């Protein structure tokens, strides 16, 4: 079917192509086949068939410099002929599919089978009239008042309850899936790209990019479509996502101009004409093939032939952009195997979430909470299974011994159905114990809490891409933050200048500067900066000018404007195409250089970069009249002391601008960087200010109070970094903390062979607060070192911020990676877990608050559920063993299970966070999930509930003067006695739900209760349904209506929970040291073996990425 739809699609397009042959000089299929070529072959084809890239632009009716005119009719025609830049998403699961998935629950299946057997047997009547008598006690009262006719009710009621549970689960999954789709589209809307339309450079949503658009590409971009390079500067692309080639591919208009969607720009910049979008791009073609294969695969899976690699297209490459899925081609046993790698947050709810985990590149280990919950759920599940098995065995043995040993009855064939009915009843009791014991509400509580938090976190400028990151953030013990843009405003202004042997503490009047130096300075800045960087007039009068592009370059262009010059005429005179050679900025060079050809045929190269790095390469400097003089090492040292250090101590970034002339005979070897980028002449040093964000010092103080260490990891000079760290409050004067640069850091952590040693890192990181002049490698090493450290009791949970392409490995290695939404590159965003849409550090503090709130919500739910579990299991078990019947019937247990699991998780998982969450230390990895206070609450309330229920069970009939419900025969009518027990049990749970809102021993359990309307409505709603069940539930719910007095007693005993809660709060925890702490993760048993292997793979993966990035 997929093939058919594809062929229809192409046939339709071919018809379109025929109709529009005159409209454009090339068809869709021609462009598709052109994009399949590479290297020289592509250049030749382009030249011969199209007359080069200019000829291609003519055919596509676009201008290489001005782009598309932007007329709506033209844009619509392009959409119609060449398609839109989006790939249709996978259809969401229907409600029925979700119902079917919910039905797969093992305990529910067991219950369904038991209920069906019960139903079947209730309609079976043994032949002959004597059966009842001769079967003796076993059949006692079976036929009383025709009650046997109603024997089907219990089976039917269980089935009905199962239907309720399934529908509620399916509805939850459906709403969750809908929410994830909303999150997905939000992430996609964030994705924009720079294109030229009508001579204007505009940011366009990726979905609106069309064939013929001229796209501007720069370092860090994720290409949104296929295209042909028009002009490029030192352009290197990582094509591993499509071709599996791990080395970066050099692209140039004359050697290899083909650019493919979904590949990363690792270095350089350029312009390309878009030739294929959406399903017609190289990535889109693969997606379409995979999408067409999904249905076949699903059919195969149904037949049991599950496809080995799980290639289903689980995400969508909406807007033709590869952020949501990356196609990895792995060489496996010599064969290239395709692997779909969805990289955005799960788009299709839980099932897709699982699929995503299965298929994506080995992600970090399970989040802290997931690890603890899995362990706890397994422990509880095992205990529940054991209890239910023991219950069934005891019931069967009790029955067998009583009938066949004590009363010496023979086994009579006609009695077999009656005996089987008893055994089925025992089995149902056992399953009921299991249903109540197994905490299947745990994953639901986690999901609800995370989904609720993620939605609210968007308002706090946190766009969560991986759900578990939200909760992991609550455990964070360390944050390694960038400086620029995160702690500072990222609005660069040149405030000091050193030129012609004079340091100006304010930008001087241009008249006082040597004219030669001024001309060189203005030309060097105007030409040697990205032409996409501009300063535009302010949006509103009196506002600040708008900075577009690289902010450091904006600061330098601002200096040109302050010196009463303009950079645009110079750029117009030397357009980007005329730049002879560009050495783009990267983390190894730490400088950018541009070569131009002068009118006399010679060459001039302008350079700019970190002052200490560029000055080392200078052999001359311009003097007071603008003439070069020799610049000796002695002069350099003096300049560092008198100019650079004082500027850096004021918190300024220092940028040195320099130049060098080359003769054209012979032409230099431009690839010999070491010789080219040397022997420079310094023009000036500029001090650029990037002020600290006003809200940052307070945010850092909150982190420190919350037990989180904030470290600054920056590429800036050590003095600049220290000055900013003091302003932010990361360090305070006189404190014994380390501020070191990358060089010193590497000296301290590496042995004689140059290998990193964990023991050496352990001596550095605890005191380290500022790491300056650091490379992405240093950042990754630091993060890895802190995470792998075992010196503290608790393993550190590290959050990292990053914006550059090279921050990818560190972001992946961190427990939580934050990418910058504004300044961040697409590569960084893709490697991250959370995107900060405002690039602001204080948003990270909000993420910590939400993370802790998730942890607390889950703990509240656990405290509540475990109390119910403990009590219900003990009651069912003891009751069954003593009275041969469970005081709480299967249907009642299912209702309690529904209260416990679905409603309580909704009520307790949606509590809003408060500032008080930041007043305590992180929980840490090895702290038990259930604290001693929680254990005290669980056991305390459990004891209260058990005393009440057993009192009611054994002496209840005397207290209320009613018939006893104990030892009632099979199918006997519901008793008032057992109804009171059931009703009191539910009332105690309802009031205990209010107690469960507090888990740290607080006395006021009502504090802030009305701020959570969901909680209030669920408590009142459950109460109302309980009234209906007791008064009108009748036989299906095994309930007898109660009068007002008995109701008041039930509510009174429930209210006792609140009073008892105050009693428990008074008991000091120190008395309860004997309590075992459940759900604890120790260093050794932190993860199952397969996860440990996955973690190792992850490290290798990150390190491989890092090695690949080292040429940067």
UniProtKB/Swiss-Prot annotation:
<feature type="binding site">
    <location>
        <position position="807"/>
    </location>
    <ligand>
        <name>Mg(2+)</name>
    </ligand>
</feature>
<dbReference type="Pfam" id="PF00690">
    <property type="entry name" value="Cation_ATPase_N"/>
</dbReference>
<feature type="compositionally biased region" description="Basic and acidic residues">
    <location>
        <begin position="351"/>
        <end position="363"/>
    </location>
</feature>
<feature type="topological domain" description="Cytoplasmic">
    <location>
        <begin position="910"/>
        <end position="929"/>
    </location>
</feature>
<dbReference type="InterPro" id="IPR004014">
    <property type="entry name" value="ATPase_P-typ_cation-transptr_N"/>
</dbReference>
<feature type="compositionally biased region" description="Acidic residues">
    <location>
        <begin position="1087"/>
        <end position="1098"/>
    </location>
</feature>
<feature type="transmembrane region" description="Helical">
    <location>
        <begin position="889"/>
        <end position="909"/>
    </location>
</feature>
<keyword id="KW-1003">Cell membrane</keyword>
<keyword id="KW-1133">Transmembrane helix</keyword>
<dbReference type="InterPro" id="IPR008250">
    <property type="entry name" value="ATPase_P-typ_transduc_dom_A_sf"/>
</dbReference>
<dbReference type="InterPro" id="IPR023214">
    <property type="entry name" value="HAD_sf"/>
</dbReference>
<dbReference type="GO" id="GO:0005516">
    <property type="term" value="F:calmodulin binding"/>
</dbReference>
<protein>
    <recommendedName>
        <fullName>Plasma membrane calcium-transporting ATPase 2</fullName>
        <ecNumber>7.2.2.10</ecNumber>
    </recommendedName>
</protein>
<feature type="active site" description="4-aspartylphosphate intermediate">
    <location>
        <position position="482"/>
    </location>
</feature>
<feature type="topological domain" description="Extracellular">
    <location>
        <begin position="879"/>
        <end position="888"/>
    </location>
</feature>
<keyword id="KW-0813">Transport</keyword>
<dbReference type="Pfam" id="PF00122">
    <property type="entry name" value="E1-E2_ATPase"/>
</dbReference>
<feature type="topological domain" description="Cytoplasmic">
    <location>
        <begin position="1"/>
        <end position="94"/>
    </location>
</feature>
<dbReference type="InterPro" id="IPR023298">
    <property type="entry name" value="ATPase_P-typ_TM_dom_sf"/>
</dbReference>
<dbReference type="GO" id="GO:0005524">
    <property type="term" value="F:ATP binding"/>
</dbReference>
<dbReference type="GO" id="GO:0016887">
    <property type="term" value="F:ATP hydrolysis activity"/>
</dbReference>
<comment type="similarity">
    <text>Belongs to the cation transport ATPase (P-type) (TC 3.A.3) family. Type IIB subfamily.</text>
</comment>
<dbReference type="GO" id="GO:0046872">
    <property type="term" value="F:metal ion binding"/>
</dbReference>
<dbReference type="InterPro" id="IPR006408">
    <property type="entry name" value="P-type_ATPase_IIB"/>
</dbReference>
<feature type="topological domain" description="Cytoplasmic">
    <location>
        <begin position="174"/>
        <end position="373"/>
    </location>
</feature>
<feature type="transmembrane region" description="Helical">
    <location>
        <begin position="930"/>
        <end position="952"/>
    </location>
</feature>
<feature type="topological domain" description="Cytoplasmic">
    <location>
        <begin position="1066"/>
        <end position="1112"/>
    </location>
</feature>
<feature type="transmembrane region" description="Helical">
    <location>
        <begin position="95"/>
        <end position="115"/>
    </location>
</feature>
<keyword id="KW-0406">Ion transport</keyword>
<keyword id="KW-0547">Nucleotide-binding</keyword>
<keyword id="KW-0106">Calcium</keyword>
<feature type="transmembrane region" description="Helical">
    <location>
        <begin position="1012"/>
        <end position="1033"/>
    </location>
</feature>
<feature type="transmembrane region" description="Helical">
    <location>
        <begin position="1044"/>
        <end position="1065"/>
    </location>
</feature>
<dbReference type="InterPro" id="IPR001757">
    <property type="entry name" value="P_typ_ATPase"/>
</dbReference>
<dbReference type="GO" id="GO:0043231">
    <property type="term" value="C:intracellular membrane-bounded organelle"/>
</dbReference>
<dbReference type="GO" id="GO:0098839">
    <property type="term" value="C:postsynaptic density membrane"/>
</dbReference>
<dbReference type="InterPro" id="IPR044492">
    <property type="entry name" value="P_typ_ATPase_HD_dom"/>
</dbReference>
<keyword id="KW-0460">Magnesium</keyword>
<keyword id="KW-0112">Calmodulin-binding</keyword>
<feature type="transmembrane region" description="Helical">
    <location>
        <begin position="374"/>
        <end position="393"/>
    </location>
</feature>
<feature type="transmembrane region" description="Helical">
    <location>
        <begin position="971"/>
        <end position="992"/>
    </location>
</feature>
<feature type="compositionally biased region" description="Basic and acidic residues">
    <location>
        <begin position="298"/>
        <end position="311"/>
    </location>
</feature>
């Amino acid at each position: 079917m997929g093939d058919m739809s594809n062929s229809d699609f192409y046939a339709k397009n071919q018809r379109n192509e025929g109709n529009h042959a005159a409209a454009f000089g090339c068809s869709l299929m021609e462009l598709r086949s052109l994009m399949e070529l590479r290297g020289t072959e592509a250049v030749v084809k382009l030249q011969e068939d199209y007359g080069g890239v200019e000829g291609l632009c003519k055919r596509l009716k676009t201008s290489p410099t001005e782009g598309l005119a932007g007329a709506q009719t033209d844009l619509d025609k392009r959409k119609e002929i060449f398609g839109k830049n989006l790939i249709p998403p996978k259809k969401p699961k229907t409600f029925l599919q979700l119902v079917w998935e919910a039905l797969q629950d093992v305990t529910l299946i067991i219950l369904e089978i038991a209920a069906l057997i019960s139903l079947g047997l209730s309609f079976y009547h043994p032949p002959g009239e004597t059966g009842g008598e001769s079967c003796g006690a076993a059949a006692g009262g079976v036929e009383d008042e025709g009650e046997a006719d109603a024997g089907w009710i219990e089976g039917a009621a269980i089935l009905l309850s199962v239907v309720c549970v399934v529908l509620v689960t399916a509805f939850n999954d459906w709403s969750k899936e809908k929410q994830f789709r909303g999150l997905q589209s939000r992430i996609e809307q964030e994705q924009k790209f720079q294109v030229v339309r009508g001579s204007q450079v505009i940011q366009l949503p990726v979905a609106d990019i069309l064939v013929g658009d001229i796209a501007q590409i720069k370092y860090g971009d994720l290409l949104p479509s296929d295209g042909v390079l028009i002009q490029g500067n030192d352009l290197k692309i990582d094509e591993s996502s499509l071709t599996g080639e791990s080395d970066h591919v050099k692209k140039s208009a004359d050697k290899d101009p083909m650019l493919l969607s979904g590949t990363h720009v690792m270095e350089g910049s350029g312009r390309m004409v878009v030739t294929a979008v959406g399903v017609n791009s190289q990535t889109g073609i693969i997606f379409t093939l995979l999408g067409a294969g999904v249905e076949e695969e699903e059919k195969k899976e149904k037949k049991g032939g599950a496809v080995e690699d799980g290639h289903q297209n689980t995400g969508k490459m909406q807007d033709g952009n590869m952020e949501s899925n990356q196609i990895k081609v792995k060489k496996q046993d010599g064969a290239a195997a395709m692997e779909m790698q969805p990289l955005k947050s799960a788009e299709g709810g839980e099932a897709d979430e699982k699929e995503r985990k299965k298929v994506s590149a080995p992600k970090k280990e399970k989040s802290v909470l997931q690890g603890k919950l899995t362990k706890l759920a397994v422990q509880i599940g095992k205990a529940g299974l054991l209890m239910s098995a023991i219950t069934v065995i005891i019931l069967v043995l009790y029955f067998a011994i009583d009938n066949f040993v004590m009363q010496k009855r023979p086994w009579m064939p006609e009695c077999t159905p009656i005996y089987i009915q008893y055994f089925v009843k025992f089995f149902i009791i056992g399953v009921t114990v299991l249903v109540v014991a197994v905490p299947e509400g745990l994953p639901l509580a986690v999901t609800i809490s995370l989904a609720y938090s993620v939605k609210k976190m968007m308002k706090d400028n946190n766009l969560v891409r991986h759900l578990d990151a939200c909760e992991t953030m609550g455990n964070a013990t360390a944050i390694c933050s960038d400086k620029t843009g995160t702690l500072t405003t990222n609005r660069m202004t040149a405030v000091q200048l050193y030129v012609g042997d004079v340091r100006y503490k304010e930008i001087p009047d241009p008249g006082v500067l040597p004219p030669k130096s001024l001309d060189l300075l203005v030309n060097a800045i105007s030409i040697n900066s990205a032409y996409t960087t501009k300063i535009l007039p302010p949006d509103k009068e009196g506002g600040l000018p708008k900075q577009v592009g690289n902010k450091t370059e904006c600061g330098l262009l601002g200096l040109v404007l302050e010196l009463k010059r303009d950079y645009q005429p110079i750029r117009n005179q030397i357009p980007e195409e005329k730049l002879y050679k560009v050495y783009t900025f990267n983390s190894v060079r730490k400088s950018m250089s541009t070569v131009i050809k002068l009118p006399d045929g010679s060459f001039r190269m302008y350079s700019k970069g970190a002052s200490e790095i560029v000055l080392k390469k200078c052999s001359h400097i311009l003097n007071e009249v603008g003439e070069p003089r020799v610049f000796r090492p002695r002069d350099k040292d003096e300049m560092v002391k008198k100019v650079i250090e004082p500027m850096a101590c004021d918190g300024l970034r220092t940028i040195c601008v320099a130049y060098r002339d080359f003769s054209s005979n012979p032409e230099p070897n431009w690839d010999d960087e070491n010789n080219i980028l040397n022997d420079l002449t310094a023009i000036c040093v500029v001090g650029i200010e990037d002020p600290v964000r006003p809200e940052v010092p307070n945010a850092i103080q909150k982190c420190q109070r919350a037990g989180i260490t904030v470290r600054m990891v920056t590429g800036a000079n050590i003095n600049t970094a220290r000055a900013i760290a003091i302003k932010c409050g990361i360090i305070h004067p006189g404190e014994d903390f380390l501020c070191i640069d990358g060089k010193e850091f590497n000296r301290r952590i590496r042995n004689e062979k140059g290998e990193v040693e964990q023991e050496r890192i352990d001596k550095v990181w605890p005191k380290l607060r500022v790491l300056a002049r650091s490379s992405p490698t240093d950042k990754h090493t630091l993060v890895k070192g802190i995470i792998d450290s075992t010196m503290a009791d608790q393993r550190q949970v590290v959050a990292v911020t990053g914006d550059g392409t090279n921050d990818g490995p560190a972001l992946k290695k961190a427990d939580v990676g934050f990418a910058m939404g504004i300044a961040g590159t697409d590569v960084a965003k893709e490697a991250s877990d959370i995107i900060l849409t405002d690039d602001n550090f204080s948003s990270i503090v909000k993420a910590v608050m939400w993370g802790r709130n998730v942890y607390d919500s889950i703990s509240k739910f656990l405290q509540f559920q475990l109390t119910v579990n403990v009590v219900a299991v003990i009651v069912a078990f003891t009751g069954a063993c003593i009275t041969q019947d469970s005081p709480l019937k299967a249907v009642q247990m299912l209702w309690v299970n529904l209260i416990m699991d679905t409603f309580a998780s909704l009520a307790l998982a949606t509590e809003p966070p408060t500032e008080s969450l930041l007043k305590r230390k992180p929980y840490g990895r090895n702290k038990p999930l259930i604290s001693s206070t929680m254990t005290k609450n669980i056991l305390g309330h459990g004891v209260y509930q058990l005393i009440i229920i057993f009192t009611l069970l054994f002496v209840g009939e005397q207290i209320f003067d009613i018939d006893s419900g104990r030892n009632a025969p099979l199918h006997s009518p519901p008793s008032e006695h057992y109804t009171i027990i059931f009703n009191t049990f539910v009332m105690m749970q309802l009031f205990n739900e209010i107690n469960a809102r507090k888990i740290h021993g607080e006395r006021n359990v009502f504090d802030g209760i009305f701020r959570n309307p969901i909680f209030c409505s669920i408590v009142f709603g459950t109460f109302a349904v309980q009234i209906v069940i007791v008064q009108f539930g009748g036989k299906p719910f095994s309930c007898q209506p109660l009068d007002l007095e008995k109701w008041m007693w039930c509510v009174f005993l429930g209210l006792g929970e609140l009073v008892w809660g105050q009693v428990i709060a008074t008991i000091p925890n120190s008395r309860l040291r004997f309590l075992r702490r459940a759900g604890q993760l120790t260093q050794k048993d932190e993860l199952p073996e397969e996860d440990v292997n996955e973690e190792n793979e992850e490290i290798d993966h990150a390190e491989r990425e890092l090695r690949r990035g080292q040429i940067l």
